[in-house]
């Protein structure tokens, strides 16, 4: 389907506000996305009509809240190409999902000298948990390098995968370069060496069709807030048998079957990984976000991202005096464009754009090793979503021109 951006924008109340008297042009969607009124309405409806704790009551409100919570789990599984709902674990965010794998799967299994293969474009959320684990276990971290064109150096994959490799953890779509990595190829290579594969899908699940069974990974992590949902809700997906072989990550209520003074037994999966009271309202309302994206169609969401990214790359290149990072073609990347004007610091540019109502991100984007690879301290980053249109890209380009005028710099 063709996107009617103006119609979509009407579903997002925040897009009606002005920033410094200007229309809000929100281009920071890789950090978080705005929420449609369907989500906000469901959030209010939950508290107004069924607010109760789940899985631990037999009264009507508790049963209704539990049913809606578990319905959201089934919708997540369906959204991911028919994953098994028993393998869908709700966490606080993608970061916690990755830490869960590091501590509940990897830590008991890794020994000194075992290897974990990462890449040079990982978000800190898929670096720091493994740095901590390496300190705890004596495991060795290895890294698949990033080529100058923004793609991974897959020619090095077979050399870096060894008999000592226990896990490969790879970002699906870079939050800096936009690069979409061939995770199926990487997962298959890992499996041939007897290793498991974790896919950080925080920047892919919101923007393209993602089928957990088809990707071939053993674990998949993402966050709800990057796809029209709430903060405080993340997802870890795995096969139920993989989760069953793992001990819990956190202990407390909800994740137990029986507790005695000196011992305990665990609940079935996925609940043995959901200790304590979760963000019930957020999970319930997240189903509305998934319904909204399903109605739009993820193929259409992806096509819109490619079209808008291509337009942005063309317009920014025509502007001149900008360095653009990542693959040259829009088809190889998500809706993320990072760039620098070597005469204006990215933080200054972001500040001046904000005065024009334009929200971008400036900094290292929680990817400092990648910044070192690019030999820059930071970049400016524009990232798009379903409510962005070519007029937003035009506003960004004009905003950069205005920033150059502010500094009395020539601009084509």
Where are these regions (language model features)?
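Pyridoxal 5′-phosphate
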Residues: 1-412
């Amino acid at each position: 389907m063709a996107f009617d951006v103006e119609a979509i924008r009407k579903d997002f109340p925040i897009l009606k506000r002005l920033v410094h008297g200007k229309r809000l042009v929100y281009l920071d969607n890789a950090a978080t996305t705005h929420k449609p009124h369907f989500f906000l309405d469901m959030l209010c409806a939950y508290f107004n009509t069924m607010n109760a704790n789940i899985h631990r009551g037999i009264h009507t409100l508790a049963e209704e809240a539990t049913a809606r919570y578990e319905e959201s789990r089934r919708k997540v599984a369906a959204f991911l190409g028919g994953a098994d709902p028993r393998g869908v674990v709700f966490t606080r965010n993608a970061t916690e999902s990755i830490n869960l794998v590091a501590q509940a799967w990897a830590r008991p299994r890794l020994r000194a000298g075992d290897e974990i293969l990462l890449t040079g474009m990982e978000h800190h959320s898929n670096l720091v948990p493994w740095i901590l684990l390496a300190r705890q276990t004596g495991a060795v971290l290895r890294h698949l390098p990033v080529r100058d064109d923004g793609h991974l150096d897959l020619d090095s994959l077979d050399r870096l995968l060894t008999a000592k490799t226990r896990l490969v953890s790879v970002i699906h779509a870079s939050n800096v370069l936009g690069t979409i990595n061939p995770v199926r190829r990487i997962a298959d290579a890992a499996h041939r060496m007897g290793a498991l594969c974790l896919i950080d899908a925080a920047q892919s699940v919101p923007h393209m069709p993602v089928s957990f069974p088809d990707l071939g990974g053993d674990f998949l992590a993402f966050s709800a807030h990057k796809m029209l949902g709430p903060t405080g809700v993340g997802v870890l997906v795995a096969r139920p048998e993989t989760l069953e072989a793992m001990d819990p990550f956190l202990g407390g209520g909800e994740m137990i079957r029986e507790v005695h003074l000196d011992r305990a037994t665990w609940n079935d999966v996925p609940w043995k990984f959901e200790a304590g009271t979760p963000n019930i309202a957020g999970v319930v309302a997240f189903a509305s976000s998934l319904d909204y994206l399903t109605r739009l169609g993820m193929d259409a969401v992806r096509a819109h991202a490619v079209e808008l990214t291509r337009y942005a790359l063309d317009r920014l290149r025509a502007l001149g005096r900008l360095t653009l990072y990542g693959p040259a073609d829009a088809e190889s990347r998500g809706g993320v464009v990072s760039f620098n004007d070597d005469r204006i610091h990215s933080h200054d540019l972001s500040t001046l754009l904000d005065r024009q109502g334009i929200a971008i991100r400036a900094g290292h984007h929680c990817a400092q090793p990648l910044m070192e690879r690019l030999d820059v301290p930071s970049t400016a980053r524009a990232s798009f979503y379903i409510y962005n249109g070519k007029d937003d890209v035009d506003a960004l380009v004009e905003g950069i021109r205005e920033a150059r005028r502010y500094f009395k710099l020539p601009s084509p």
